[in-house]
């Protein structure tokens, strides 16, 4: 892998391509990311680049004359994390991820990675946490068929048989049943980069991208190149 970046999802829109065809796209605010650590084979056993994305204030704990503590930015970057960022010469970051770049030795601490690492026509893999749907039935969750909708039907959206009752007298593992849906890590592969706005750090990717608005998105060059 040579190219990757962290982004947040803005939403969907549609644009016309050069042939006048209307194309649905997802708009991502990609970067700028900064290099917070460079891992080497000698020190860490493998080669990788750690990047940070999105500013986050430092958590500050102060004491008054009576020794009572007051906390500013309670959910901010703690002292240990801030030391890590200061060592790299960057401000506190909200998200930190690691990429195993093939050209990791070409990066330096505090280098910026922007949206222009990608170009129009590039194929990318996009990873995010999907939207949570809560507890759902087998029809919505797994696409099972519903029952007859006639007046005399005993069930409509009820799940079908779970298995024989006398033998084996149990429900096998992996049986599709109602349960929690969504809020899982999802990767959509081989999506096309339709447009890159380097000035505004925007990537326009063809089609839908998993995750809600403002969700953290990981964009990498595809592993299915040429397919």
Swiss-Prot record:
* Pfam families (alphabetical): Ribosomal_L3
What's in the keyword line of the UniProt record? Ribonucleoprotein, Ribosomal protein, RNA-binding, rRNA-binding
Entry's InterPro entries? Ribosomal_uL3, Ribosomal_uL3_bac/org-type, Ribosomal_uL3_CS, Transl_B-barrel_sf
Query: What is the top-level taxon of the source organism?
Result: Bacteria
What are the recorded GO MF terms, alphabetically? rRNA binding; structural constituent of ribosome
Q: Where does the signal sequence lie? A: none
Is RNA-binding included in the keywords of this UniProt record?
yes
Keyword hit for Ribonucleoprotein: yes
Provide the function of this protein: One of the primary rRNA binding proteins, it binds directly near the 3'-end of the 23S rRNA, where it nucleates assembly of the 50S subunit.
What does the sequence similarity comment in the record state about its family? Belongs to the universal ribosomal protein uL3 family.
Assembly description: Part of the 50S ribosomal subunit. Forms a cluster with proteins L14 and L19.
Q: Which PANTHER family match?
A: 50S RIBOSOMAL PROTEIN L3, LARGE RIBOSOMAL SUBUNIT PROTEIN UL3C
This protein's name: Large ribosomal subunit protein uL3
Lineage of producing organism:
Bacteria, Bacillati, Bacillota, Clostridia, Lachnospirales
State the encoding gene. rplC
């Amino acid at each position: 892998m040579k190219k990757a970046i962290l982004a947040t999802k803005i939403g969907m829109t549609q644009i016309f391509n050069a042939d006048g065809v209307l194309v649905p796209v997802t708009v991502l605010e990609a970067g700028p990311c900064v290099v917070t650590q460079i891992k080497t084979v000698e020190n860490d056993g493998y080669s990788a680049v750690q990047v940070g994305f999105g500013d986050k204030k430092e958590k500050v704990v102060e004491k008054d004359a009576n020794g009572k503590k007051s906390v500013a930015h309670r959910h901010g970057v703690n002292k240990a994390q801030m030391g890590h960022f200061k060592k790299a010469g960057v401000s506190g970051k909200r998200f930190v991820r690691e990429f195993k770049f093939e050209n990791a030795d070409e990066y330096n601490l505090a280098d910026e990675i922007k949206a222009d690492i990608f170009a129009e026509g590039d194929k990318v893999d996009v990873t995010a946490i999907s939207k949570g749907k809560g507890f759902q039935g087998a029809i919505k969750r797994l696409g099972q068929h519903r029952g007859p909708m006639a007046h005399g039907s005993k069930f409509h959206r009820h799940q079908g048989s779970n298995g024989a009752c006398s033998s084996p007298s149990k429900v096998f593992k992996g049986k599709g049943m109602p349960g929690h849906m969504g809020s899982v890590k999802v990767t959509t592969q081989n999506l096309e980069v339709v447009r890159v706005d380097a000035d505004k750090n925007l990537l326009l990717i063809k089609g839908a991208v998993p995750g809600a608005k403002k969700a953290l998105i990981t964009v990498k060059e595809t592993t299915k190149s040429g397919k």
